[in-house]
Amino acid sequence: MKRALRGLKNAATSTIARITGSQGTINTTDQSSDTTTAGPHTAHSHAGPHAPNTTAGPHTPAATHTAPNPGRYAIDPRGAIAAVIVTHNRVDLLERSLDMVAKQTRRPDWVIVVDNGADPEVETLVHAKLGGEPQSRRASAEIAARRFAEIQTVGAAITKASEEVPDGAAANDNADATPSTSASSSPSAASGDVPQRRPRPMYLPSRTNLGGAGGFALGFLAALALGADSIWCADDDGRPADENVLATLLDVAEREQLAQVSPLVTNINNPDRLAFPLRQGLTWRRRVSELEGDFLPGIASLFNGALISARAMEIIGVPDYRLFIRGDEVEYHRRIVRSGLRFGTSLTCAYAHPDGSEEFKPILGGRMHTQYPDGEFKRYFTYRNRGYLMSQPGMRRLLPQEYARFAWFFLVQRKDVAGFREWLQLHTLGRQERFERPE
């Protein structure tokens, strides 16, 4: 075993040397989505570091077929928009996210909240922020209103049959009945008091924890069923940095004819720092001030404020539920790249998110990175799903680089043979499409 590991270490060293000698043609990004909640009940992959696949091009090359017509699949700035937020047991954070989504100068037409915890407190919050009533309360009110109307009808009939009505009194009775009729219709009248520009809420509780992948898949399909022309992805622990984010994304999408556009994802506690390192050219950037220009084509941070055309989903589909958490964002990015659709990141707006850069460990003086999450639960999904991703079209040729980087990180930098063995086992599970979840 030691001899095999020594040979693998030597192979990693030589492969690393070849890679670093051709940095201009190979993208070394290794980022996948994450969660901050450890344990088997983790909500979704975007409740913490969601590290996007930060560059297109050589990382996941587009398929050789003719690129789709940009105009056909581009985001319609005048179309209906549904915001989709996936949450799990984080009511306080969700409240801040909902506040900023509802304050947008260009408000979404719907806000769909997928609740992986089916928590009544979340349902109450959604309707408190966006209007309407929780379904259980609304159903009870409707039943009570119907029963009250029935009692009124029966009472009126009994009164009419048992009393002698003097001449001319019928007109007065009818006059008295008029307010009663309008009172019975008051619930619908009250609903008209809600400002028409306020987003319409849709609360989707799930008694099965769908993870981030399944949560966004459900939310996307619900948005399509409503007739949304575009879907705006939001998160419960992140939020738009200001009230102009959605309007800015629409402007950029129209100008660039984009099927998908993302804001810059910044550190929620330090707006000048990126929440995740981003590679521009051959250099890894960690600060907003280090970025050049106002638009980065072919770069996307999905599920963190990204706006996606509904027509584009005819081609790229919805996130893969099997991945549950971590890697679903990278896999979705892979599909966008291979589709040939136009996409990119606007540097003129931001989505604030907790810092996720700590689990990306630099190697070779920062020229490359590997991912090492805290906790076995996070590592299980990160490395297993990464193995699956590396077996998919557009990413297979990066497999030697993947082995080299992680062998270097575990065997040379950390001197952690057990850690490398764990990585290798989980990576193999992913390549074999073994999607069982740990107990």
Give the positions of each predicted feature.
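A short, conserved alpha-helix in the catalytic core of glycosyltransferases
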Residues: 312-316, 322-349
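Non-catalytic, C-terminal membrane-associated alpha-helical segments of glycosyltransferases
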Residues: 391-439
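Acidic donor-binding segment of Leloir-type glycosyltransferases
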Residues: 100-204
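Glycine-rich, basic loop-to-helix element that forms the pyrophosphate-binding segment
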Residues: 161, 205-225
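N-proximal low-complexity "stem/linker" segments adjacent to membrane-targeting elements
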Residues: 1-39, 44, 56-103
